[in-house]
């Protein structure tokens, strides 16, 4: 079965959002640490969360864009974590998370993932 356009769109959106999350997290980290004269290093665990999410998104996007996908089904947890990106001021991540949930619940996308051979 040929990969639906929505699956391709999802994989590209996740890749772009992952790259943006890594850049956003790094920029936020640098701004807080330098803006507080290194006192912001205490906030490091919280500031690194967007970067960690970005790395997971990049890996998931690469696995989803491959043919055949190395993903058994779309990750609902990843979409929820993307929507939680609004806590760090990342509106793009919120939009991508909502689009991911809507597209992954589409009948065509569900049918495509169900038709994939189980490894």
Describe the predicted segments one by one.
Residues 2, 38, 87-91, 102:
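Flexible interhelical turns and helix-capping residues at alpha-helix boundaries
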Residues 45-46, 80-91:
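Individual transmembrane alpha-helices with interfacial aromatic-anchor signatures
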Residues 49, 92-97:
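Short, aromatic-rich membrane-interface segments at the entry and exit
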Residues 1-24, 53-81, 96-119:
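Membrane-interface extramembranous regions at the lipid-water interface
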Residues 28-30, 48, 60, 64, ...:
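Hydrophobic membrane-targeting signal helices
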Residues 23-53, 66:
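Membrane-helix interface segments in multi-pass membrane proteins
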């Amino acid at each position: 079965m040929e990969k639906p356009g929505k699956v391709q769109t999802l994989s590209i959106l996740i890749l772009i959002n992952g790259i943006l999350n890594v850049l956003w997290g790094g920029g936020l980290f640098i701004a807080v640490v330098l803006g507080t004269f290194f006192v912001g290093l205490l906030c490091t665990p919280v500031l690194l969360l967007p970067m960690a999410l970005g790395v997971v998104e990049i890996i998931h996007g690469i696995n989803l864009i491959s043919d055949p996908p190395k993903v058994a089904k779309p990750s609902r947890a990843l979409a929820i974590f993307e929507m939680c990106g609004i806590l760090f001021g990342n509106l793009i991540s919120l939009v991508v998370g909502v689009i991911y949930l809507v597209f992954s619940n589409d009948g065509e996308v569900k049918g495509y993932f169900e038709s994939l051979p189980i490894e």
